[in-house]
């Protein structure tokens, strides 16, 4: 046999062997993996349907809320859009299953038998033709030795068989190569169809989401505005110190943990550096009307009183003696419960009995005197009953009345008490009330610090220095010249001999320890002991 024919034969057999032992098993494995991919598609579709159905239910619940209708509409639209895209994804799954996997599985089973038969047929035909050619060549060699007269005819027959054999092996190799190419082209064309289906799906998804996402973003950003996020009926009158982001509940679901510097006094923040302000905190220019509406300036004698208490995080309205029994406070302004049934509703001047000794995030829990209604209410809306009723529309500054009533010479500016309106005491530090006049800060800065440290915290910033309850308003309005002179003397002596700090600056070994404030998300009624 000629070497070139043997080479053609070996090459053709290698192609058939590659199809049978490599391509077809790989195609079977591809069908198996495709079925797993298909099951994952169905699982994804079912999980997405359940997930976005739950989002739609939450959005429908938000539509019933008077404060979150815009956000509820956004959630419902998002859910509908995603479910529509999920249905379009089913078309991709059907194309992948019907147009690719089924054809691959069917063709693989048929092709295995077809390639096997083709290989056997080629091998038998090649051997038969090779045997005939070998036989004719042997006969020609014998006839040439005998010098037979039919040698010429035999040579022509051998040449004809040789040409046929060469044409056969060449055509068989081209046919085997064509079969191999046809199979790879089938695989490429089927996946091209799948890719085209994916392209159509993603094109529709892009066109559907491109404009809607921008609209949802604008509506979501617009809902951050307090005028749209809350209705006027739920907010009530703008009296008392404001709450960040208009929060009217004692919980902080979305409040991140704050650094220690935000819970210390304004003066300590200047020494330790700024950790950043809360994004939702209102600026000092917006806090100014609230400071004028609810003034609470302690008198000189109560400001520098030497009465020591064990903690500076006591609840608002606690008696100076620290005795047992419920504390009573008087409402400065009206408070509406709105749609939240856990809030306490009362009017200005009502007396509320505080049932929880400590405030939680600036909220107290109490019971309206004379009724069985109980619930949460802002600490800034009430005042200790011992201070007496105060008209919120007519602020009283004790230092101003004391200065106008006293005929004494004006005090030295170095000893002058800064005239500023202090907010209702929360559970944060009051060290700025005892600052020396030289280190006093501006009123707007003090209020900015107070607005950032609204959440109750047990993290001490310096020595505990709780402020006792101020004098009743009746005493401030009817203070005589004798009381004024006594208060001024106490003030002068307090400024000359300031109270000793428990931990002087630089001696507290735990001054740099940062504690994480505790936050409760429980809106239910507390356990009253």
Curated annotation (Swiss-Prot):
Main location: membrane
Alphabetized UniProt keyword annotations: Cell junction, Cell membrane, Cytoplasmic vesicle, Lipid-binding, Membrane, Phosphoprotein, SH3 domain
Subcellular location: Cell membrane; Cell junction; Cytoplasmic vesicle membrane
Matching InterPro entries: AH/BAR_dom_sf, Baiap2l2_I-BAR_dom, I-BAR_dom, IRSp53/IRTKS/Pinkbar, Pinkbar_SH3, SH3-like_dom_sf, SH3_domain
GO cellular component: cell-cell contact zone; clathrin complex; cytoplasmic vesicle membrane; cytosol; nucleoplasm; plasma membrane; vesicle membrane
Tissue distribution of the protein: Expressed in the epithelial layer of the intestine (at protein level).
Transmembrane regions listed in the UniProt entry: none
Domain IMD: 1-239
GO BP term (any one): actin filament bundle assembly
SH3 domain sequence ranges: 324-387
Gene3D superfamilies assigned: Arfaptin homology (AH) domain/BAR domain (1.20.1270.60), SH3 Domains (2.30.30.40)
Membrane topology according to the record: Peripheral membrane protein
Entry keyword Thylakoid: no
Region feature (Disordered): 221-327, 403-510
Stated role: Phosphoinositides-binding protein that induces the formation of planar or gently curved membrane structures. Binds to phosphoinositides, including to phosphatidylinositol 4,5-bisphosphate (PtdIns(4,5)P2) headgroups. There seems to be no clear preference for a specific phosphoinositide.
Domain notes per entry: The IMD domain consisting of an antiparallel dimer of three-helix bundles, featuring on one side a positively charged. The N-terminal alpha-helix inserts into the lipid bilayer. Also forms homodimers and homooligomers. The residue Trp-141 is essential for oligomer formation.
Protein name per the record: BAR/IMD domain-containing adapter protein 2-like 2
Source organism (scientific name): Homo sapiens (Human)
UniProt gene name: BAIAP2L2
């Amino acid at each position: 046999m000629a070497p070139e024919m043997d080479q053609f034969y070996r090459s053709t057999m290698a192609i058939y062997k590659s199809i049978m032992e490599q391509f077809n098993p790989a195609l079977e494995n591809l069908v198996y993996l495709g079925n797993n991919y298909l099951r994952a598609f169905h699982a994804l579709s079912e999980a997405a349907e359940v997930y976005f159905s739950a989002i739609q239910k939450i959005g429908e619940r938000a539509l019933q809320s008077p404060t979150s209708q815009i956000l509820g509409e956004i959630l419902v639209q998002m859910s509908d859009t995603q479910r529509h895209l999920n249905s379009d994804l089913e078309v991709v799954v059907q194309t992948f299953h019907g147009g690719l996997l089924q054809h691959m599985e069917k063709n693989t089973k048929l092709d295995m038998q077809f390639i096997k038969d083709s290989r056997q047929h080629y091998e038998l035909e090649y051997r038969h033709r090779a045997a005939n050619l070998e036989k004719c060549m042997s006969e020609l060699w014998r006839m040439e030795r005998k010098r037979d007269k039919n040698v010429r005819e035999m040579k022509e027959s051998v040449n004809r068989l040789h040409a046929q054999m060469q044409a056969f092996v060449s055509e068989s190799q081209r046919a085997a190569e064509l079969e191999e190419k046809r199979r790879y082209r089938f695989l490429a064309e089927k996946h091209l169809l799948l890719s085209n289906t994916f392209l159509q799906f993603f094109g529709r998804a892009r066109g559907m989401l491109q404009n809607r996402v921008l609209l949802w973003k604008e509506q979501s950003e617009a809902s951050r505005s307090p005028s749209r996020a809350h209705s006027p009926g739920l907010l009530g009158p703008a009296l008392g110190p404001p709450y960040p982001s208009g929060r009217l509940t004692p919980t902080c679901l979305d409040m991140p943990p704050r650094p220690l510097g935000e819970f210390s006094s304004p003066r300590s923040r200047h020494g330790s550096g700024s950790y950043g302000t809360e994004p939702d905190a209102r600026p000092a220019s917006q806090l100014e009307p609230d400071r004028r509406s609810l003034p609470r300036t302690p008198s000189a004698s109560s400001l520098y009183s030497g009465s020591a208490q064990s903690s500076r995080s006591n609840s608002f309205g606690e008696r100076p003696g620290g005795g047992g029994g419920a504390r009573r406070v008087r409402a400065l302004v009206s408070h509406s419960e709105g749609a939240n049934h856990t809030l306490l509703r009362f009017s200005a001047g009502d007396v509320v009995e505080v049932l929880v000794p400590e405030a939680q995030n600036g909220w107290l829990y109490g019971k309206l005197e004379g009724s069985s209604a109980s619930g949460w209410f802002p600490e800034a809306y009430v005042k200790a009953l011992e201070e007496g009723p105060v008209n919120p529309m007519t602020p009283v500054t004790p230092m101003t009345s004391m200065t106008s009533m006293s005929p004494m010479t004006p005090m030295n500016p170095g000893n002058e008490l800064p005239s500023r309106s202090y907010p209702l005491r929360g559970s944060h530090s009051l060290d700025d009330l005892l600052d020396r006049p030289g280190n006093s800060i501006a009123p707007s800065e003090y209020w900015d610090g107070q607005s950032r440290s609204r959440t109750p915290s047990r993290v001490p910033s310096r020595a505990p220095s709780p402020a006792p309850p101020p004098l009743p308003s009746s005493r401030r309005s009817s203070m005589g010249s004798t009381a004024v002179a006594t208060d001024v003397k106490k003030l002068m002596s307090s400024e000359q001999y300031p109270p000793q700090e428990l931990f002087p600056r630089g001696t507290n070994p735990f001054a740099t320890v940062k504690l994480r404030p505790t936050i409760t998300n429980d809106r239910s009624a507390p356990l009253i002991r």
